[in-house]
């Protein structure tokens, strides 16, 4: 069975418990995909960075406990783990407040990338494209896996407030879509 690599952010979501407290929960679309693949019996591996902090170690342990290969998940001593407060409105719609910007995941660089092999997949989300050096590393990973004979899955998962420039967002999305063999689209 070939590896399905997932590149991006492993996030600690702080969710309201209904009693005025926030619950610490593992999150981030890429981390959720990696866990889902593992739970379905696939071989998943996570590529990314979290802070060398309590939240980062929590995410590393959570992914490992879920049978996700974390060999390529780096603990970054200089940057903090992405942390998001999730709010629910009366209709159950979510909104996100990103508490740590820039977070460790945005400092992913080419040295953090594994060697890819033919037949493997790489799944990425657009948050990894929102800033350098993660943007360049992500595009490099997409190119490298295609050159090795692998495939790319892309989830636009657009969070416009994380981008400084709408033109840059559009250009990055167009480039990523052109690299993708599969695109995951949702109403959001």
List PLM regions with ranges.
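Positively charged, low-complexity intrinsically disordered leader regions
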Residues: 1-17
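Ribokinase/PfkB-type carbohydrate-kinase core domain
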Residues: 1-5, 64, 70, 90-188
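Substrate-binding N-lobe of the ribokinase-like
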Residues: 3, 18-93, 100-107, 111
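Acidic active-site catalytic centers that drive phospho-/nucleotidyl reactions
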Residues: 9, 13, 32, 155
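Cofactor-binding loop segments of dinucleotide-utilizing enzymes, especially the Rossmann-like FAD-
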Residues: 9, 48-52, 157
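Feature marks short, surface-exposed loop/turn motifs that line or immediately flank catalytic pockets
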Residues: 14, 54, 160
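A short, mixed-charge helix-start or loop-turn motif at secondary-structure junctions
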Residues: 15-19, 123-124
């Amino acid at each position: 069975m070939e590896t399905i690599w997932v590149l991006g952010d492993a996030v600690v979501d702080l969710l309201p418990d209904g009693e005025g407290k926030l619950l610490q929960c593992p999150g981030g679309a890429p981390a959720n995909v990696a866990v889902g693949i593992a739970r379905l019996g696939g071989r998943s591996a996570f590529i990314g960075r979290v802070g060398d902090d309590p939240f980062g170690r929590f995410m590393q342990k959570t992914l490992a406990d879920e049978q996700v290969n974390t060999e390529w998940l780096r603990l970054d001593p200089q940057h903090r783990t992405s942390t998001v407060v999730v709010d629910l409105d009366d209709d159950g719609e979510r909104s996100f407040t990103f508490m740590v910007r820039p977070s460790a995941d945005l400092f992913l660089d080419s040295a953090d990338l594994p060697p890819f092999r033919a037949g493997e997949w790489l799944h990425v989300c657009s948050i990894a494209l929102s800033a350098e050096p993660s943007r360049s590393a992500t595009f490099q990973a997409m190119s490298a896996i295609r050159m090795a004979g692998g495939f790319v899955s892309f989830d636009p998962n657009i969070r416009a407030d994380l981008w400084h420039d709408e033109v840059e967002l559009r250009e990055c999305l167009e480039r990523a879509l052109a690299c993708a063999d599969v695109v995951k689209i949702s109403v959001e």
